[in-house]
């Protein structure tokens, strides 16, 4: 096709094509096989390679055709790369998490040292964080050819052998990567404990920097979870204007986090719930100020052992959670049920 903006040339001479996906294919659909990510393990909603590794095909002017690369890149790199390839300056007010892949694409696509941060340092690390939901309660970090998985669901879970898993996906020789264990078949956490500890510390530092959220434990889980008997008890609340005060009792575990969960449309067909920090005042007191228009609210307390106590007890009725919450309009908590028995996460 002729390029109308560039007489005498084809569109293909002035066009970059990027083909990729947002995640690995979904596996485990009941009754049928939709996708199979073999030889990679697992699929969508997993931090294993079958869930996080996706196809990536790029073509365009200056990019050598028919070349395969094992260099680690991700979707955050597309924006700075497109700006670079099209000659557009990065907006001064923008902080870009991705890297410009133009030096890699227009040079040696097998040379991982060409992928650099804006400060010029080579990027060799990536982090994935899937803290909630089903089989994806995990975080991972990849540094060079090694990948560490932190499983948050390892406590009292017979399906999980260890809190951490370590895999050697690639080995590097003379600056070039070669495939070693992208199937994640050989867990090296016991044979390389130092490597695992080092990467676990790097992962924790990265998650702390981004203020990541973590899964909470349910003290009413039937499993024998350690320290669940030490979860706090919420005693009372007092509402005045758009401020609310709660009183709670610690039972052996220190409360470390408090959040107010509120909605502006409680009781409607599609409720929306929001979270804001509440203030731990010491001596068993929590205070919070909620937005004008709030109809219902809950208090979430998390202790040092990562157990969650919700007040009042969260009971869903259909798709509504307002029925069991504190009602701002009437300031009531139903006396017919325990006000602080169960947590609302596992």
Model regions and ranges:
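Metal-dependent active-site segment of extracytoplasmic phospho-/sulfohydrolases and closely related
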Residues: 1-31
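Intrinsically disordered, low-complexity Ser/Thr- and acidic-rich flexible linkers and loops
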Residues: 2-9, 115, 175-179
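C-terminal cap/loop subdomain of S1 sulfatases and analogous C-terminal strand-loop tails that border
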Residues: 25-37, 41-47, 64, 71, ...
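The feature captures the short pre-catalytic strand/loop hairpin that immediately precedes
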Residues: 56-64
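Tryptophan-centered short beta-strand motifs
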Residues: 26, 266-283
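Loop/turn elements at helix/coil->beta-strand transitions in domains of secreted/extracellular proteins
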Residues: 11-17, 53-54, 122-123, 143-146
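Long, internal low-complexity/basic segments
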Residues: 78, 173-183, 188-257, 261-265, ...
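Beta-strand elements within well-structured catalytic alpha/beta cores of enzymes
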Residues: 1, 16-21, 55-57, 78, ...
């Amino acid at each position: 096709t002729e390029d109308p903006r560039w007489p005498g040339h084809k569109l293909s001479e002035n066009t970059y094509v990027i083909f990729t996906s947002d995640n690995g294919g979904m596996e485990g659909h009941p009754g049928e096989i939709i996708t199979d990510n073999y030889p990679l393990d697992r699929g969508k909603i997993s931090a294993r390679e079958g869930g996080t590794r996706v196809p990536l095909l790029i073509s365009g002017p200056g990019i050598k055709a028919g070349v395969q690369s094992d260099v680690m890149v991700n979707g955050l790199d597309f924006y700075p790369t497109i700006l670079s390839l099209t000659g557009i300056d990065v907006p001064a007010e923008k902080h870009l998490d991705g890297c410009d892949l133009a030096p890699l694409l227009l040079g040696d696509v097998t040379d991982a040292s060409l992928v650099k941060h804006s400060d010029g340092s080579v990027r060799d690390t990536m982090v994935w964080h899937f803290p909630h939901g089903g089989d994806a309660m995990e975080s991972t970090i990849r540094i060079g050819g090694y990948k560490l998985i932190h499983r948050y669901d390892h406590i009292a879970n017979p399906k999980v052998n260890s809190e951490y898993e370590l895999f050697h996906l690639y080995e590097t020789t003379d600056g070039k990567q070669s495939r070693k264990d992208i199937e994640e078949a050989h867990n090296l956490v016991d044979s390389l404990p130092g490597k695992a500890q080092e990467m676990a510390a790097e992962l924790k530092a990265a998650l702390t920097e981004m203020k990541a959220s973590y899964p909470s434990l349910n003290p009413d889980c039937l499993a024998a979870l350690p320290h669940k008997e030490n979860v706090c008890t919420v005693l009372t609340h007092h509402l005045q204007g758009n401020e609310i005060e709660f009183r709670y009792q610690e039972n052996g575990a220190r409360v470390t986090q408090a959040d107010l969960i509120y909605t502006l449309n409680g009781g409607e067909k599609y409720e929306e719930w929001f979270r804001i920090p509440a203030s731990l005042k010491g001596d068993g007191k929590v205070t919070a100020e909620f937005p004008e228009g709030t109809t219902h609210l809950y208090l979430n307390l998390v202790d040092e052992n990562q157990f969650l106590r919700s007040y009042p007890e969260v009971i869903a009725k259909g798709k509504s959670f307002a029925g069991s919450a504190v009602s701002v309009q009437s300031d009531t908590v139903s006396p017919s049920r325990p006000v602080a028995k169960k947590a609302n996460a596992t």
